[in-house]
Amino acid sequence: MLNKELQEKLSDLDIGVEFAEEVSEFLTLTVPKENLHFLMNKLKTDIDLSFDYLFCVTGMDWGQSLGVIYHLESTVHRHNLVVKVQTSDRENPILDSVYDIWQTAEFHELEVYDFFGIKFNNHPKLRRLFLTPEWSGYPLRKDYVDTANMIIK
């Protein structure tokens, strides 16, 4: 399916998705956090979409908000999609887990939690992955203060 066709089909869902203006190889959209799980489930289960492969999950700090970028591929239809979601709550950032849709999300969500502090509702075992439980803060956030000078900016 071409990006234009994908955009038309996803626009019909009427869940507040916004499409990126810039031209890219992958169609890119932003979804409101309250509609993330619904959209992701639809992307995988709709026979015309069949996004069966979640190949990358990236945490982001956009300054005023924190979020996640998901890269999806349909191995059936050979199309790709980038889905962005964000929350303005920097003190207690919470998004829905997509682990129940793609089990590969388990590791990725642990990494995002560890470095950005974004919690995922319904994750099977959310915990620190690389950093010790005693580690203070989230080192990939823009406001992280490295008191030990271990990170060179």
Residue ranges and their predicted role:
Residues 1-153:
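Terminal low-complexity/charged segments
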